[in-house]
Regions:
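Active-site loop-to-helix "anion-binding N-cap" substructures in soluble metabolic enzymes
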Residues: 1-102
Length: 102
């Protein structure tokens, strides 16, 4: 059987303002100073909170993702975020095709 990484992911939907997101990210980072080998922890906050959460989980073993991504690289797509934009904000994952977005 191939070695697989267990991915534990979560998001808080459209909840928490920036201050609440910062507090939650701080709590997550303190609660997870390390994770076992073969496990990856991922958090996907709302887009407006990505940079705040990124700054607070940088030193923790927590990956950052987005709740949605738009397929075009650039353009007049109000309210959307491209892969490059999310990557530049520190995201390494993204939820794609969630039933709430279809």
């Amino acid at each position: 059987m191939p070695n697989r990484t267990l991915l534990i992911a979560g998001n808080w939907k459209m909840n928490n303002d920036v201050a609440e997101a910062a507090k939650l990210a701080d709590e997550l980072a303190q609660a997870l100073p390390e994770v076992p080998a073969g496990v990856e922890v991922l958090v996907c906050p709302p887009t407006i909170d990505i940079t705040t959460v990124h700054d607070r989980i940088q030193a923790a073993p927590i990956a950052l993702g987005a709740q949605n991504v738009y397929w075009e690289a650039k353009g007049a797509f109000t309210g959307e975020s491209s892969c490059d934009m999310l990557k530049s904000a520190g995201c390494t994952y993204c939820i794609i095709g969630h039933s709430e977005r279809r």
